[in-house]
């Protein structure tokens, strides 16, 4: 969940995004979510960085317990919803760069899907039927987002890795205390 900066003059807006984000100053918000991350958020306030960092830490404990093999990683699909139509590519670049610059994930391969990418999936699978876009995507009501995540495993299993047997959904503000568990 990504939104526009709280302060357009903030030094926390990545330089490569500053000019691209300015047109959104005058745009109305299209979608409302409970806790979107502003593009000018401090790193310690960024749920994506927080969640991925702690999930990777939890997986390191599972590795030490023998539940993951050497060089084995989980595939994590990150659904990237935005509050403003047109913000998708900016948000994609923002998230991609934050993960690359701030995290050294040892046990997670992250795959980011925004509305543009989910739309391409639907148009590829069903080129003559756009009705599915109302059901499958990451922006807007929770049902579309949930449907995307639910069917992502089926698509992943058919196209990427046939050995996948299960998936689960987490919010990145959740963490798992593996030492306690």
State the predicted function of each range.
Residues 179-181:
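Acidic donor-diphosphate engagement hotspot in glycosyltransferases and nucleotidyltransferases
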Residues 1-82:
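N-proximal low-complexity "stem/linker" segments adjacent to membrane-targeting elements
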Residues 158-177:
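Short beta-strand-to-loop acidic/aromatic patch adjacent to the donor-nucleotide binding site
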Residues 1, 73-77, 109, 162-168:
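Beta-sheet entry/capping signal
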Residues 86-164:
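Active-site-proximal specificity loops/subdomain of glycosyltransferases
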Residues 45, 49-52, 71-74, 84-87, ...:
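Intrinsically disordered, low-complexity regions
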Residues 9-11, 84-88, 177:
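Short catalytic/ligand-binding loop motif for oxyanion handling, primarily in non-cytosolic enzymes
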Residues 53, 148-152, 170:
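P-loop NTPase catalytic cores that bind/hydrolyze ATP
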